[in-house]
Amino acid sequence: ILQMLNINAVCKMLFLKMSSKAEILSTIIKNRRSIFPESYIQQEIPTNIIEQILESANYAPTHKLTQPWRFTVIRKEGKAKLGAELGRIYKETVPAEKFLQKKYDSFGQKTSQAEVIVAINIQFHEDKVPNWEEIAAVGCAVQNMALTAEALNVGAYWSSPPLIDHLGDFLGLAENEKCYGLFYMGYHNAEQREANRTPMADKVKWIEG
């Protein structure tokens, strides 16, 4: 009887532990928001925190284990170089009649406000899997990063301006690699916003027979 009681106690403890883990994960998922650079404060993100956020990306699902995510970490003086490069690309690619000085200036402002910027790159393996699967895998990897950042109280958001199509040389990308966005990060003072979501029941169909 004592042995059975012990087994029941262990099972109950395991259930409570698993329930707690699920609740913690659900809270992190539901609290995650895009936090923009204007809310960032000038506080350094330690290297080990950056590495922890990146490491979480490495456990995203990936068909045939191609692990297509490739990241370029940009910080310190590198941020100004990125801002200047984005400004240069904008100036060279936008028609003169559509050029906006405010838009041009915003690239340098955003990169300077962020503490760290991670270029999100994809390495394609067309001989192994379709490109869309690699894109989906990297999307999962970035979600892991966003959730880990939320858990560590680091603000983050994934920016994908059209200019990223021209960042290959700046980032030193190979022919089978492409930039799919910039992941801005920084400690912040933004207030928690309510999630703007319609009911999940409106987006699900069940087939049971």
Residue ranges, per PLM feature:
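C-terminal helix-cap and adjacent tail motif
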Residues: 19-28, 36, 181-209
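N-terminal amphipathic, basic helical "cap/leader" segment at the start of enzyme domains
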Residues: 15-113, 209
